[in-house]
């Protein structure tokens, strides 16, 4: 029995040591070309009411509680959500809009607390606009441990890819 406990203690210590070497910040990013100029894309990003048409997280729990405050759109627009199972809870605020993109401050409450910055950056292309969606934030110790067992870039990146595909559809059909 003592031998099993010793092995377990060594495994836990190893996991904690490896986790402590992971970066203190995270960065996730995906991009997609949308067949439209930035001025056609921006309205879908600066009005949180329009996010329901393309956001991957809105589809997790279509009946989640939503609230909107601040400006109707653009800088100062705010959105909060509270899901019962999958979507968690948090809030977003648009803090910057310019010809190169949109910046959104995110505050997660559930399933864990975190503050991140999401950016939508526009790069003109011959056939439209390359929209790069990125998110940067702190990598907590528990996040580092979790990251040892789950590929967070793959998980978050998949959501970004789904969201960008939905945004592309919303803009191009718009």
Model-derived segments and their meaning:
Residues 3-71:
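Hydrophobic ligand-binding cavity/cleft-lining segments
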């Amino acid at each position: 029995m003592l031998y099993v406990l010793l092995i377990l203690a060594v495994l836990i210590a190893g996991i904690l040591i490896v986790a402590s070497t992971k970066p203190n910040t995270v960065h996730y990013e995906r991009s997609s070309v949308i067949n439209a100029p930035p001025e056609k894309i921006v309205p879908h990003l600066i009005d949180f009411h329009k996010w329901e048409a393309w956001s991957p997280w809105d589809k997790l729990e279509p009946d989640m509680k939503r609230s909107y405050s601040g400006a109707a759109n653009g800088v100062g627009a705010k959105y909060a959500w509270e899901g019962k199972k999958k979507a968690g809870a948090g809030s977003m605020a648009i803090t910057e809009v310019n010809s190169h993109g949109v910046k959104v401050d995110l505050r997660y409450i559930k399933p864990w607390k975190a503050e991140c910055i999401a950016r939508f950056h526009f790069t003109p292309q011959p056939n439209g606009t390359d929209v790069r969606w990125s998110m940067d934030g702190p990598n907590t110790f528990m996040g580092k441990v979790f990251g040892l067992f789950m590929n967070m870039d793959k998980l978050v990146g998949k959501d970004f890819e789904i969201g960008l595909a939905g945004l592309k559809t919303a803009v191009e059909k718009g």
